[in-house]
Amino acid sequence: MPHSEKPVDQERIVERVQRHGDSIWALIEAQGMATRAPFPDPRTLRSFSLGEVAEILGVSGSYLRQLSIDGLGPTPELGTAGRRSYTLGQINELRDYLASSRPKEALKFCPRRRQGDKLQIISVVAGPASTTTSFYLAQGLALQGFRVLAIDLDSHGSLSGMFGYYSFGYPVHNASMYAAIRYDDDQKSIRSVIQPTLFDGLHLVPGSAELSIFEEDCGRLFRSENFKYPDASSRMVSALKEVDADYDVVVLSCGDGGFLTAGAYEAATGVLVTVRPEMPDIVSMTSSLYSFTHFVALIERAGRTVNHDFFKYLVTRHDPRDVSQQKSIAMLREPLGDDLLTATVWESDAIRQAGDKGRSLYELSSGSVGRSSYEQAMKSLNSANAEIMDIMSEVWGRAPFYVSQASRSTTAGKASSESRGLSK
């Protein structure tokens, strides 16, 4: 069929689309957004009830209430009927107060690195719910008092979007990890791209389309050097050394970039692989394992040793009522043994609904997504995070206690005493 003929002076489709894009971008620039991209969605973090704070800190609500009455520690906000609530910043102030007033339990209240403890760098391999896992792990660690840096290595900025940072797919200049690892004269310190988040003690290096430029640069070097492995991953290691003293944990959320993923593997002290207990996902996960061994072989061929303190697997999107999934988990347990975490993260409408609201469950109260679903999801999330924190504790030579604490509590987002009208 011949193309329809149009008058010479009629605007072509491609020209109209170009005009649309230019016009909309001009409006965005006029509002001052384009110059700040990736820019955060303006939102605030809710306060936490006294019952929630008691669970997070592992103390009783009556003890916290008495501290408030005695004027000790931060002053909580008083709401309806005198109910007390604390910001996350105030929770961390409470940590410092409790650590100083109860020195024998200082590590419980203030679990940050001590002298001689190495920075924990956890690489979360791209897979089922891996971005969500990175998101909840980073926020969960921050709620427990750790200083956390989350790094989005996805050129689509998936993790960044969860934190409220949006780049619209544009390769914004030096706004991602690319700034710290690029090969040209525009290389900057990683500090220049670290952004705040809603969570006190949790920072983010956003992802951006410019990360794909790094992949292209590495590919050209790889080919031009007769397939000798370039120093792409050692650049990641060097960049993180700049902020070694500033954080306790770094969470590297991997995307689909090969060289960036290799960098995450070399920099990591531990690796976390997510897997959904369905056969196609298990096959895909197995491919990721072969990719890991391939990347490590290339790095070691370049004369650098790759060592990890742990390599763990986490079952995500688990439906415990699905018999076939239970069989798949049992099948995985045989070859993986203790490397497969005991906790699983359940398939959850609450997590999906929170995502639809552009929030995490930690940012919402139970009434926002349904109390029963909320509490169930929080229990599975907190159980998985507790296992990972116990692994970190063992690496630092500490006795693990997070799993036992999680088993005694309800959820970090649920205050059972408050629901009975007791927490004020």
Regions found by a protein language model. Give the residues of each.
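Cytosolic-facing regulatory segments adjacent to core modules
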Residues: Q187-D200, P206-A262
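Beta-strand-loop-alpha "switch" segments that mediate conformational coupling across diverse proteins
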Residues: S208, R317-S324, S328-L364
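C-terminal boundary of histidine-terminating zinc-finger modules
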Residues: A354-A384
